[in-house]
């Protein structure tokens, strides 16, 4: 089993030293879901939501969040992201929104946390914009779908 990289021999949390690592192209994809009532989803899809374009706002929030991950999660490194993409899809047959994020860079550490943060904050933004209409929406699951690059190699969720 692998060891935790953020904990030293004394059990104290520290930011990992990546200064000796080689720069490689790294990419990560994550997804999140927001489950809601059909009426709430219809407000979003039809563009009739009183707060405006829910998907556009959630997309921008997710992108901004990816860029601020280092500021939100204490042991994450500040990264020079080269790409952040957030896609939102209404799945009307299941009364949910699927959010997929992609983050990419050429660097010394991975972008999994940035992708997860982007998807999570986009989901939270949908909740925030729709909570006046429905308070019992459910966010989840949120998960890493795939990551490439770096020493640990390629990871992909099995279908």
Curated annotation (Swiss-Prot):
One term of GO molecular function: cyclic pyranopterin monophosphate synthase activity
Which reaction(s) does its UniProt entry say it catalyses? (8S)-3',8-cyclo-7,8-dihydroguanosine 5'-triphosphate = cyclic pyranopterin phosphate + diphosphate
Q: Which domain of life is it from?
A: Bacteria
All disulfide bonds of the chain are: none
Work out whether the entry's keyword set contains Lyase. Answer: yes
Enzyme active site: 128
Question: Pathway membership of this protein?
Answer: Cofactor biosynthesis; molybdopterin biosynthesis
Residues holding substrate: 75-77, 113-114
**An individual GO BP term:** Mo-molybdopterin cofactor biosynthetic process
State which Enzyme Commission number(s) the record gives: 4.6.1.17
Q: Which UniProt keywords apply?
A: Lyase, Molybdenum cofactor biosynthesis
Q: Which InterPro entries match?
A: MoaC, MoaC_bact/euk, MoaC_sf, MoCo_biosynth_MoaA/MoaC, Mopterin_CF_biosynth-C_dom
Q: Describe the protein's quaternary organization and the partners it interacts with.
A: Homohexamer; trimer of dimers.
Which family does the entry's similarity section mention? Belongs to the MoaC family.
Q: Tell me the protein's name.
A: Cyclic pyranopterin monophosphate synthase
- Phylogenetic lineage: Bacteria, Pseudomonadati, Pseudomonadota, Gammaproteobacteria, Vibrionales
Gene label: moaC
